[in-house]
Amino acid sequence: MNGDDAFAKRPRDDDKASEKRSKAFNDIATYFSKKEWEKMKYSEKISYVYMKRNYEAMTKLGFNVTLPPFMCNKQATDFQGNYFDNDRNRRIQVERPQMTFGRLQRIIPKIMPKKPAEEGNDSKGVSEASGPQNDGKQLAPGKANTSEKINKRSGPKRGRHAWTHRLRERNQLVIYEEIRDPEEDDE
């Protein structure tokens, strides 16, 4: 028996793949007129499908990507002859964020004011009030002394050690012991 004949007689499992392909083609066909779509070769249609997939993937990742030329505001008709510019229900444009989530997280702490510490958890007020700078004078809980104002202004430098904010502070002290090699002691 010939192997090619057996392969040809087997029912194909490409039904799902062909459905996905036709759905992708229908999505792309909305950007072209009926005449343009009929003139296009299969390879051109596939390349447009991949362009649209790449564009959608990049925007989901948060990159600022320019819209492919065929997806720009071009008046096109679907296969029923309806203009998409007139049909607002079918052509809803979603506003894409211009900024990634990571950039937004770095900006928000600068914009948002710091919350005042609770009186029960404020350990800085006691130690700073009796320091040599204050000459033993008590400070009001809402007012900061001049050294605190200077320290607030001179925060960590932006470009230097950018990863340090990601490190967590250890709750328990970790002690390391040096491991000695018995062979080194003999020498």
Curated annotation (Swiss-Prot):
The residues forming a coiled coil are none
UniProt keyword Transcription regulation, yes or no: yes
The question of whether Transcription is a record keyword is answered with yes
KRAB-related domain: residues covered: 20-83
The entry's note on the tissues where this protein occurs is: Not detected in any normal or tumor tissues.
Q: Name one GO biological process term.
A: regulation of DNA-templated transcription
Looking up SMART domains in the UniProt record yields: KRAB
A single GO CC term for this protein reads:
nucleus
Which keywords belong to this entry? Phosphoprotein, Transcription, Transcription regulation
Please give the residue ranges the record annotates as the region Disordered: 1-21, 109-187
Per the record, residues carrying Phosphoserine are 123
Enumerate composition-biased segments (Basic residues): 152-168
Give the protein family.
Answer: Belongs to the SSX family.
Q: Briefly state the protein's biological role.
A: Could act as a modulator of transcription.
**Protein name, per record:** Putative protein SSX8
Q: Which organism is it from?
A: Homo sapiens
